[in-house]
Amino acid sequence: MNTATGVIALLVLATVIGCIEAEDTRADLQGGEAAEKVFRRSPTCIPSGQPCPYNENCCSKSCTYKENENGNTVQRCD
């Protein structure tokens, strides 16, 4: 087997292995097991004193308007 044939054989093997692995982690739009493999969300929350867009993102579950260092009123987690 010469060098060109060896390179072609390796490319074919790599393509086949890549397709098999891609099938295992394919996104499942129905929210099944494959979706759990691809999208892993860790429960995170915004700590106290940080800007908050929504109450549910704060660790304290509470967000109030406060004055910042520039004198502007912004929402911050309690």
From Swiss-Prot:
Signal peptide: 1-22
Source organism per UniProt: Atrax robustus
Entry-linked InterPro entries: Omega-atracotox (IPR009415), Omega-atracotox_CS (IPR018071)
Function: Insecticidal toxin that reversibly and voltage-independently blocks both mid-low- (M-LVA) and high-voltage-activated (HVA) calcium channels (Cav) in cockroach DUM neurons. Also causes a modest block of insect sodium channel currents (Nav). Induces potent excitatory symptoms, followed by flaccid paralysis leading to death in house crickets.
Gene Ontology BP, a term: defense response
Protein name, per record: Omega-hexatoxin-Ar1e
Signal listed as a keyword: yes
GO molecular function, one term: toxin activity
Any one Gene Ontology cellular component term annotated for this protein: extracellular region
Tissues where the protein occurs: Expressed by the venom gland.
Site-annotated residues for Critical for insecticidal activity: 51, 68, 76
Miscellaneous comment: This toxin comes from a male specimen. It is observed that propeptide sequences coming from male specimen are identical but have only limited homology with the female paralogs, but the reason is unknown.
Record family assignment: Belongs to the neurotoxin 08 (Shiva) family. 01 (omega toxin) subfamily.
Chain residues in the propeptide: 23-41
Intracellular or extracellular location(s): Secreted
